[in-house]
Structures are given as C-alpha cells and as structure tokens.
C-alpha cells in the first residue's frame, strides 16, 4: 500500500509535493525533500524512478546518487546538489526471517505486531536531518555532517512483527489527532482509498506532505 499526499501549507505557498517513494517487490522506499532545496521534489522523484530502474539493489548499491550524475540529468556541483538532492531516505526490506529498515534522515517506522497492535518509532534528528547528498558536497560548504553520513540500520524479527512500514514525518499529524483510531483501522485492513479520503477530509490539519509505504 502506497500513499503520497501534498501538505496543506505547500498548497497555500504554491509549492509542489516534496515527498515521493515506491514499492518494488520486497523493498519499500520513501524520500522527503528539504524545503530549502529549490527543486528537491524533482531530485526525489528522479532518484526513486532511477533506483527502481536499477531493480532496487539495496545491498550492492553503495553510491546511491551516481546513477543520477552519470545520467547527466543532475550534475555534481554543490549548488546543483543543494537544489535537487537534499532529501531524507527510508527503506524497509523484507527478508526471510526479519525486516531491515535503512534510514538516512528523519521519518517514522510503523510496526504491526501479529495481534495487529500498531507501534510507531519516530526517527528524530532535531531539525538537522542528515541528507545522503552531504557525502557529495565539500565540507567547506557544510555546517553539519562535515565527515559525511551513512545509513542507520534497524532489524525487526518476523516472529514478533507481521509487517513493517515506513512514513515521512508528515504522519505525525495523524498520530496526534482525534482520528488516529480511524486511520489505524484502515491501515491494518490495507484500505488505501479510505486513508486518502481521510487525509482529504482533514487536509487543513496536514501542514506537511505525507507519504506512507506499508
């Protein structure tokens, strides 16, 4: 199940949806563009589409952005990287005995237990999310993460969890709302359109874009 909706504040300001993502076989991915990047929504979508074109080789692909640089769509100069490639990345991979979450930046992990109880793990970075793009920017241009960034890995055993999903930090507006129970019922039953209708109905509450891969 994949949901991607623009935040109300972006509509008010005339901005595009800066979130994107995909579901490809046993891999789910979500990216959340930085509002300071002039065209981060373009880079986010290009990254997802190009990454899917590669077959989503999460284990073997270490240099995630070279596929964009080599395609001559985006160059690797600092200004171009800042304008197009500042976005957080969340992956969740389903393996035989466990789920693996790869994170570079903030977001929310949705954990469904076998009794259908939902748990949420918020990845906080104190408003200083680490963007994978920082690995390609000379340190003199950076105020944080001058030594580069890596993905953080989290493992969840399948004998404890039925499913693991991921979401951009826009999900926080649901978790702190009066309709959280309504949302969770639809999520557990994989009712994608019901969740989209809920977000449309309460759209003014959702200041930020929201993307869910579950």
Outline where the language-model segments fall.
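N-terminal entry segment of metal-dependent catalytic domains or homologous docking segments
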Residues: 1-53, 107, 146, 154-155, ...
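Short helix/loop capping segments that flank catalytic or ligand/cofactor-binding pockets
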Residues: 38-40, 111-112, 174-176
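C-terminal catalytic subdomain
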Residues: 76-79, 84, 94, 141-214
């Amino acid at each position: 199940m994949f949901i991607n909706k623009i935040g109300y504040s972006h509509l008010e300001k005339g901005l595009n949806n800066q979130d994107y993502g995909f579901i490809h076989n046993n891999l789910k991915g979500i990216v959340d563009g930085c509002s300071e990047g002039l065209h981060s929504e373009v880079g986010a979508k290009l990254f997802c589409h190009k990454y899917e074109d590669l077959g989503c080789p999460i284990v073997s692909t270490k240099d995630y952005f070279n596929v964009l640089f080599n395609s001559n769509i985006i160059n690797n100069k600092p200004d171009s990287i800042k304008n197009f490639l500042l976005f957080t990345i969340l992956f969740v991979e389903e393996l035989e005995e466990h789920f693996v979450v790869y994170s570079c930046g903030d977001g929310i992990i949705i954990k469904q237990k076998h009794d259908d109880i939902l748990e949420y793990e918020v990845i906080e970075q104190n408003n200083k999310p680490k963007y994978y793009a920082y690995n390609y920017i000379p340190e003199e241009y950076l105020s944080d993460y001058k030594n580069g960034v890596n993905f953080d890995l989290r493992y969840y055993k399948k004998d404890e969890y039925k499913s693991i999903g991921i979401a951009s930090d826009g999900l926080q507006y649901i978790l702190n709302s009066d309709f959280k129970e309504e949302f969770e019922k639809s999520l557990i039953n994989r009712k994608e359109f019901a969740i989209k209708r809920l977000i449309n109905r309460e759209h003014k509450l959702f200041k930020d874009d929201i993307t869910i891969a579950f």
